């Protein structure tokens, strides 16, 4: 009891002294009224008083314990509620932490993905930068090569212009030679006309001479008939006088004697004159075509030399392509090879055109030479022609006029030659 009293007075863990319950006066009276019969006896003895006080203290302790129990239950309920709230809050906090952790992991993943994409982009940008650097170097190299090619093309253009100028000068020379040929042809035609007129005059004089010879022949025959009737003595005298008479007859008409000597003289002088005219015409007819052919053949040889030079350059480029190792150099050499191949094709076309033109010029010259040979053979050395001149002068005139038409037809071809050659030259240079 003594041990309980100080403990009850001190208090406990569940019921500290400040929270100790002090019973009220009514409660003490009720407790006293519960035992009315024994109160006088109990209060009379000291033990009873101590017992009562102990009971009172015990009752108070029980009450306190009940109160503490109720308080403990309340506290337990409160703690359970607080624990539930704390657990709920903790769960919410853990959920929030999980969500935050998931968000953080997601952000980390996004950041890692972005970082990897940025790294890949940086690598790609570095590759692009290296590629652009190489492209810039290639462009600068190509620019330098293009400038060199332009300079080379400019030099080639100047050389082509010089060649074109030389070809144009050759064409001017050819045109001058062609004009000279036409002038010589015109002079030859004029000489032919003069010779035809002279032939007409000689034909007329020959006819007069033949008529006079026929008259003399008839006179001689008449004199022979008259002389046959005379005696032999007189016939001898007449025969002696006959040459005198014939000489007198020959001396009397000076026109007949002139015609007699003029005819053979003209016949003797005519072939040399024709030979001289033909000799004058032959150098022009032979020399000028040969000069044209020589110029064309020289031009063809120069173009063949250029084509051979291009072939050598083509082989050299093929050798360089086979020896080179870099792709860019091989592409540049292939481009140069294609350009050279196009130039070679154009040069071959030019050579073929020039050969065709040379063949046409040669055929034209052969036609002109054949016509001139036919003309010279028809005028000079054809005996049938001379017989036809004696028998049918009109036929001779018609043949000469026909030949003159052929001669007038030839200069058209000769005149049409230089402009066609000039056009072909312009095509060759293109």
UniProtKB/Swiss-Prot annotation:
Residues 46-213, 290-377 form a coiled coil. Keywords: Coiled coil, Cytoplasm, Cytoskeleton, Microtubule, Phosphoprotein. The modification Phosphoserine is found at residue 45. It comes from the Eukaryota. Gene3D superfamilies: 1.20.58.90. GO terms for molecular function: gamma-tubulin binding; identical protein binding; microtubule binding. Residues 248-290, 362-430 are annotated as: Disordered. Signal peptide: none annotated. Residues 249-272, 362-372, 421-430 have a biased composition (Basic and acidic residues). InterPro entries: Centrosomal_MT-associated (IPR051756), Cep57_CLD (IPR025913), Cep57_MT-bd_dom (IPR024957). Pfam families: Cep57_CLD, Cep57_MT_bd. Belongs to the translokin family. PANTHER family: CENTROSOMAL PROTEIN CEP57L1, UNCHARACTERIZED DUF1167. Centrosomal protein which may be required for microtubule attachment to centrosomes. This is Centrosomal protein CEP57L1. The lineage of its organism: Eukaryota, Metazoa, Chordata, Craniata, Vertebrata. The gene is Cep57l1.
């Amino acid at each position: 009891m003594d041990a309980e009293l100080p403990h009850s007075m001190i208090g406990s863990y569940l019921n500290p002294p400040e929270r100790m319950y002090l019973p009220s006066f009514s409660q003490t009276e009720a407790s006293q009224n519960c035992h009315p019969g024994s109160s006088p006896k109990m209060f009379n003895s000291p033990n009873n008083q101590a017992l009562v006080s102990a009971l009172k203290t015990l009752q108070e302790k029980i009450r306190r314990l009940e109160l503490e129990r109720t308080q403990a239950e309340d506290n337990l309920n409160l703690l359970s509620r607080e624990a539930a709230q704390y657990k709920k809050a903790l769960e919410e906090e853990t959920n929030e932490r999980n969500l935050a952790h998931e968000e953080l992991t997601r952000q980390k993943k996004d950041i890692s993905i972005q970082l990897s994409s940025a790294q890949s982009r940086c690598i790609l940008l570095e590759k692009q930068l290296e590629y652009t650097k190489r492209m810039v170097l290639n462009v600068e190299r190509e620019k330098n090569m293009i400038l060199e090619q332009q300079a080379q093309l400019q030099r080639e253009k100047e050389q082509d212009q010089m060649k074109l100028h030389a070809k144009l000068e050759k064409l001017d020379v050819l045109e001058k030679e062609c004009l000279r040929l036409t002038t010589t042809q015109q002079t030859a035609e004029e000489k032919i006309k003069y010779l035809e007129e002279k032939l007409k005059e000689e034909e007329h004089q020959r006819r007069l001479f033949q008529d006079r010879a026929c008259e003399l022949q008839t006179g001689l025959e008449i004199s022979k008939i008259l002389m046959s009737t005379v005696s032999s003595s007189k016939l001898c005298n007449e025969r002696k006088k006959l040459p005198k008479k014939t000489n007198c007859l020959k001396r009397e008409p000076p026109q007949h004697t002139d015609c007699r000597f003029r005819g053979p003289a003209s016949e003797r002088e005519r072939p040399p004159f024709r030979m001289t005219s033909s000799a004058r015409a032959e150098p022009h007819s032979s020399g000028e075509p040969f000069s044209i052919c020589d110029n064309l053949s020289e031009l063809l040889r120069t173009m063949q030399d250029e084509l051979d030079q291009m072939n050598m350059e083509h082989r050299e480029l093929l050798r360089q392509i086979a020896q080179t190792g870099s792709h860019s150099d091989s592409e540049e050499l292939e481009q140069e090879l294609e350009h050279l191949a196009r130039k070679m094709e154009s040069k071959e076309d030019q050579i073929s055109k020039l050969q065709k033109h040379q063949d046409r010029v040669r055929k034209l010259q052969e036609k002109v030479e054949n016509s001139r040979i036919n003309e010279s053979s028809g005028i000079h050395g054809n005996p049938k022609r001379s017989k036809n001149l004696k028998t049918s002068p009109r036929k001779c005139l018609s043949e000469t006029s026909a030949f003159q038409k052929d001669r007038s037809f030839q200069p058209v071809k000769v005149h049409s030659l230089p402009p066609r050659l000039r056009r072909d030259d312009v095509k060759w240079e293109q």
